[in-house]
Amino acid sequence: MCEHHLRTLLAQQPHGPYYLFGYSLGGTLAQGIAARLRQRGEAVAFLGLLDTWPPETQNWAEKEANGLDPEVLAEIDREREAFLAAQQGQASGELFSAIEGNYADAVRLLTTAHSAKFDGKATLFVAEKTRQEGMDPQVVWGPWVGELEVFSQNCAHVDIISPQAFEAIGPVVREILG
């Protein structure tokens, strides 16, 4: 999957510096693309990860066997209601079902994904409210990035891409990019 996105990126911008930023599966893709760009000798000026963890650190078999955590199911219901309310009658439940299907596809893709070593610096924004117990970002990402800068966010995974979260994330990114 990274190779497909890498080809698309290179068709638009054959040479760096590259600025990559991704959330969840998108972060996994951004990290994999960054690694491949560096292997080609290209400059990756920024790699931002929004609550992204190496797929190797997730126990997918356990998650599949146990089904979704009740807290996760409650969060999905909350998100569905918030989404439908925000659409003010412009979207249907079918649209949210399609979004849920995309989420299920992302989880399926992550079960077979493998991280590649990126020798540069990554900036990770961690959603502290849903961080798995014992997940130390420096330890977990150590084998996969050359350097890691971590910024904790007081939110859940699904909320790290909300306007409220970006009120805190935006200034950090602006400062880094100078």
Predicted feature residues:
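A hydrolase-biased, glycine/serine/histidine/acidic-enriched motif that marks catalytic-domain neighborhoods
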Residues: M1-G178
